[in-house]
Curated annotation (Swiss-Prot):
This is Superoxide dismutase [Cu-Zn]. One of its GO terms (biological process) is spermatogenesis. The lineage of its organism: Eukaryota, Metazoa, Chordata, Craniata, Vertebrata. Palmitoylation helps nuclear targeting and decreases catalytic activity. Succinylation, adjacent to copper catalytic site, probably inhibits activity. Desuccinylation by SIRT5 enhances activity. Binds 1 copper ion per subunit. Binds 1 zinc ion per subunit. GO terms for cellular component: cytoplasm; cytoplasmic vesicle; cytosol; dendrite cytoplasm; mitochondrion; neuronal cell body; nucleus; protein-containing complex. The modification N6-acetyllysine is found at K122, K136. PANTHER family: SUPEROXIDE DISMUTASE CU-ZN -RELATED.
Amino acid sequence: MATKAVCVLKGDGPVEATIHFEQKGTGPVVVKGRITGLTEGLHEFHVHQFGDNRQGCTSAGPHFNPLSKKHGGPKDEERHVGDLGNVTAGSNGVADVLIEDSVISLSGDMSVIGRTLVVHEKEDDLGKGGNDESTKTGNAGSRLACGVIGISP
């Protein structure tokens, strides 16, 4: 069983990141790292279904959602497994990421290994935007950078 993973995110623009995942036993997954090149403010941060970046971030598919739920916030009962919420970039364009999530895993049916991590252009409305797109994607706009999550030593 994997206990650590890493993801290097890149896109067509200046946004890039290295994000680390760690899980002890069946406990929550700690997600930490730094994203650079963002505009100041909130940006949606999600695990997407496929580990396929052959056509850029669009080939990663929809949010990772094996339980067929509607999009929501990371603390909501109704959420996609891959819904990690927002990261906040300061005026320097840097977002320091520190998330503890009890829904994703590094093994089993909820495993994010081999899937794509994506940072988006806009803020995630956490499924509360009052329209169909909100309950699918959080109205977060384009995909700025992405990478496939892989097992690390």
